[in-house]
UniProtKB/Swiss-Prot annotation:
Keywords: Membrane, Methyltransferase, Mitochondrion, Mitochondrion inner membrane, S-adenosyl-L-methionine, Transferase, Transit peptide, Ubiquinone biosynthesis. GO terms for biological process: aerobic respiration; methylation; ubiquinone biosynthetic process. Methyltransferase required for the conversion of 2-hexaprenyl-6-methoxy-1,4-benzoquinol (DDMQH2) to 2-hexaprenyl-3-methyl-6-methoxy-1,4-benzoquinol (DMQH2). This is 2-methoxy-6-polyprenyl-1,4-benzoquinol methylase, mitochondrial. Its EC number is 2.1.1.201. PANTHER family: 2-METHOXY-6-POLYPRENYL-1,4-BENZOQUINOL METHYLASE, MITOCHONDRIAL (PTHR43591:SF24), METHYLTRANSFERASE (PTHR43591). It comes from Saccharomyces cerevisiae (strain ATCC 204508 / S288c) (Baker's yeast). It catalyses: 2-methoxy-6-(all-trans-hexaprenyl)benzene-1,4-diol + S-adenosyl-L-methionine = 5-methoxy-2-methyl-3-(all-trans-hexaprenyl)benzene-1,4-diol + S-adenosyl-L-homocysteine + H(+). Present with 8100 molecules/cell in log phase SD medium. S-adenosyl-L-methionine binds at S122, D148, N179, G180, S197. It is found in: Mitochondrion inner membrane. PROSITE patterns: SAM_MT_UBIE, UBIE_1, UBIE_2.
Amino acid sequence: MLISSRIVRSSLVNVPLRLSRCFTQAHRACKEEEVNSPLSSAAEQPEQKYTHFGSKTVLKSTKQKLVGDVFSSVANRYDLMNDVMSLGIHRLWKDHFINKLDAGKRPNSTTPLNFIDVAGGSGDIAFGLLDHAESKFGDTESTMDIVDINPDMLKEGEKRAMEQGKYFKDPRVRFLVSNGEKLEEIDSDSKDIYTVSFGIRNFTDIQKGLNTAYRVLKPGGIFYCLEFSKIENPLMDFAYQQWAKVLPVMGSMIANDYDSYQYLVESIERFPDQETFKSMIEKAGFKSAGYESLTFGICAIHWGIKV
């Protein structure tokens, strides 16, 4: 069974792309004293400065480099890594992701779409979206920004484009090194479709990344995310946990890289469950947020609409 839907939301693509009561004075004074105390400041400090890197706690300022090192290490074996981690099913998930979004300039439209694929250095999702738009709608005008913080991953995407002979040096396609939490090079209200596939869990600040996605999308634009998630079936979850214990060992055997695979397993474990991530999408300002769990919840498609 490939797909197990928790939420069924028909015709996603038909959605137009277009404190509390006061405390007493004494209680307030007490609270102010607590907030201003050194103990209170010390307690808040770790939350401000630290984040997780897999199962480890690290300074926020260092996580970007640590994650970058992981993906530089696996860049030239990225497809192999995904095959190992998902037993090859990631290819079916990605196909479903692209088909469900069903994006492209319709024949009766005069306005091409502006896509942005974040953490998309390998190019597989971006090129798949453009292929779908052309094959189904005859769309050869929509544009694609392929964004990744890691130059090594973008090189793999450019290599893929050159090997396929289709999108290499295509004026519609731009490869851009940029931090997905900021996207400083991308104008606000400029994109119709924002996609991110198996990448957002590696952000230092996921909520900040979601807020930025909302910023760069036009009103009516769609946020669309494919990410590992939380398994809903207890037996399937047990089987997956056993598999996860073996993955770093396989990474060592296949790619001579135990540590990177160990981090990737731990990053999946730390990512929010489906409902929590849906709430984060809504917190960023998106409406009509929803999700579809795939393969018992091993991964999920999440979406939201900017209104």
